[in-house]
């Protein structure tokens, strides 16, 4: 009766492995990787990213009051150096270097300085770490790993970089996009790791985006904020937020495009759209690969008075354990969804709410939309439940990709979030992570 | 490897069945019950409570914007009648009468009027409903059930009343307390139903407390607010909030105590303490009986700057799926607890946080407390992890009752919440509730 997780949609994220072009990676960036033994499996656990030209950098960090040493160090390095002049980043998996006190901070600095020194970079490296918290990194392993990784630097192996930052991820996560701007074609590549503890506000995830665009620090910051809002802050797996989350973007200007300094320019908007597409695809890969997830769920809110309120309602639905358990059971339990809408904190009118369940991404579903009866069913019309065929509903929800579409009837704003179901496998995976 | 739920602590709540005295029930109240067929099992699904003397009533209702018909009706009846003059309450299980539109409201009124009419009560009955939402009640069954229940009215069978309001509860929930006040001994009895969707702010739970105390409407309201804060609003199962939640207290004055009109009087404080004890025991029974729970978990926060901030931190821990999964796995994962402290929204200083895991209720655990090494282990000292024996930790957490104690080092306020672990059984139970 209960599905084996191994039969589920875990193959999907791997398709990205066949879909990237090595000749479209941003120019001037190299990656190097190594397996230094932090991971008991012997898999790669050190990743270095190096740019021949100095980069402008923007970053968003965890809002958790408990911040890991590499987060504290990287924030400080960025501020001290005015978000520019960076040539390198070092990432380790297999240890979060969080709750590690003064020694932890010292170790993060050692990683930073060793990397920049080996790369002959004029400025200290940024640092990211992921893994178990509360344990000191074995620095003899890490130092050897960094030295080994530097010897492997090359321009085309971004997939190994994506692999080296994995923890409980089942597949490496990489997305790329190119866009023609004034003065040249610009390339973007992003890698990330996710799995458990994913939440709006970016729980336990690391993401690095590199682009050869020429863009000012201020514009880069605005672009990243926008992209993170619509990607990593629009996904939910289990509502926890980690000590290490970081999204950083490096821009080295090697594309030779006309330097972007204006957030209202066409070049800026095109680049922003492209980066948003890269981060959105990465964020969706994280949801698809979430520990124990069996379904990819799109939550679409229409008719909100403001986009922010739409986001609050979408978040309330996507964090409801009862909604997520029902989806796992392929039960179109609109009552639980409506309850989550009702307690979201937004002042909704229950008698204006309409609701649909759909297969796929719910794109053409809702008030005044196509609402193909083969792929969607309406369950609620202005607060009143509609008669429905339970067998057809269960069949709809038997798909791997399903959507819940809610019309609030309050205004014209929309919001979309992505989440997954809550499965027995989630509990199994998370009850024995450390051992 | 994974425990069978049937072997777990489900017996515990039943112990209350042996622990009540029929001669200590509040005077002047009778209960009647019937099985009218709303429950497919044929179990009792109608409960009537009747007081020979008119009662002052206070009530707290769900804050969900989507409110069930009986909630809307009862609120209106209370306001219209200034919270006094009520002789009766009718409750059905097997159907929540929520999202049922005008017809639902009409049905709730029919239940109210039929009950007061059969009881010859001068004022319409209050109404509560629980069960699946979005379906109209079968009123021919309900009306017959109310008529049948009226014929069974008696003073001693509060356990049948507790049984008749159960939905997915495994055991009936009843608590009682007596206290000597000026002018006479006062008795209190409370019944409630809980199970899934339990949250601070009282999700899917109904509770009725009856007392023969003589107390003003205003004092009764103050007393209930206090009691709910420290009981039903201090438990968490899965963070959802339902459309039907109601806690009501009826006071009929039959004890002959000196009428209480002053919230600073000794009589008021004693009665408040007694009611708080009753509601706290009921709230804890709800957690122990939560769908799929295998552990009863006490979260104690000490050293908060304000009680409210302590409550926010406790709530953040008790809603973390990762913390709750780890507890199920008997894994002393202090890192997940610390992460939940860090993202609670309270401005904590990670370098001041201490943390203990304990068996039992964590009462004697914390800074400057006994901290018996047989029953507690400290994992974090001012932000720094302590070396620990993982086997001993797992043994500690193998108990059914466990506690997490956190010292924030910010001030002198404390807060306690009760929750349960997140188990595979929870997901199973909630993925197929409707079918």
UniProtKB/Swiss-Prot annotation, chains A, B:
Pathway(s) annotated for this protein in UniProt: Amino-acid biosynthesis; L-arginine biosynthesis; L-ornithine and N-acetyl-L-glutamate from L-glutamate and N(2)-acetyl-L-ornithine (cyclic): step 1/1; Amino-acid biosynthesis; L-arginine biosynthesis; N(2)-acetyl-L-ornithine from L-glutamate: step 1/4
Post-translational modification: The alpha and beta chains are autoproteolytically processed from a single precursor protein within the mitochondrion.
Positions annotated to bind substrate: 167, 193, 204, 291, 430, 435
Site, as annotated: Involved in the stabilization of negative charge on the oxyanion by the formation of the oxyanion hole: 130-131
Annotated site, Cleavage, chain positions: 203-204
Highest taxon of source: Eukaryota
Single GO biological process annotation from the record: ornithine biosynthetic process
Stored CDD domains: OAT
E.C. code: 2.3.1.35, 2.3.1.1
Main location (coarse class): mitochondrion
Catalytic activity: N(2)-acetyl-L-ornithine + L-glutamate = N-acetyl-L-glutamate + L-ornithine; L-glutamate + acetyl-CoA = N-acetyl-L-glutamate + CoA + H(+)
GO molecular function per UniProt: glutamate N-acetyltransferase activity; L-glutamate N-acetyltransferase activity
Record: active site: 204
Keyword ATP-binding: no
NCBIfam families cross-referenced by the UniProt entry: ArgJ, PRK05388.1
Family label: Belongs to the ArgJ family.
Primary role: Catalyzes two activities which are involved in the cyclic version of arginine biosynthesis: the synthesis of acetylglutamate from glutamate and acetyl-CoA, and of ornithine by transacetylation between acetylornithine and glutamate.
Name this protein carries in UniProt: Arginine biosynthesis bifunctional protein ArgJ, mitochondrial
Source organism: Heterostelium pallidum (strain ATCC 26659 / Pp 5 / PN500)
